[in-house]
Amino acid sequence: MSTITSREIRLKSRPEGMPAADNFELAESALPAPSQNELLVKNLYMSVDPYMRGRMMDRQSYLPPFQIGQPLEGGSIGEVVESNNDQFNAGDIVLGMLGWREYFVSNGKGLMRFEPGNAPLQAFLGTLGMTGLTAYSGLLEVGKPAEGETVFVSAASGAVG
């Protein structure tokens, strides 16, 4: 495969208050064909998560801030289109921080190949992904519910319940 054109959503400016459309830009970038030990992934689903708002600000945190002019990063599910990496085959479904773009060239580090089973793919970015596991861990590890107690889960309280 030769060079491929990929659309991506980039951070154009740092939001003040609520993010607005003019803080982002849709751009195209040319990606080279994957070289030795690399693979080309087509994004199928991308997640929008609460932590991303903090990364739009230029400040020290547990994750580095998004860079102006660069694609946003977030949990994504994609399909391997082409592979020169022994760990992945064309057609594999992968989960990782692929970025907000149509296509992504990777060396495979940080990607997890998985079989979705009976769940829809997008569930692995929500209820079966980071937010669902955060809620589950919070309930069991922090809340430590005991027999006889009542647990109230409100969908209105955000992605983790």
Task: Identify the residue ranges that each predicted region occupies.
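NAD(P)H dinucleotide-binding glycine-rich loop of Rossmann-like/cofactor-binding domains
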Residues: 74-79, 87-155
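Short polar catalytic/cofactor-binding loops
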Residues: 11-17, 46-48
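Short structural boundary motif marking the start of a folded domain
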Residues: 2-9
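N-terminal Rossmann-fold NAD(P) dinucleotide-binding loop
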Residues: 161
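Short glycine/threonine/proline-enriched tight-turn/helix- or strand-capping micro-motif at secondary-structure
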Residues: 18-30, 60
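Glycine-rich beta-strand-centered segment in the early N-terminal region that forms part
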Residues: 31-48, 57-100
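Terminal peptide-recognition signature
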Residues: 8, 43, 135
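Residues that mark the start of a beta-strand
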Residues: 7, 38-40, 150
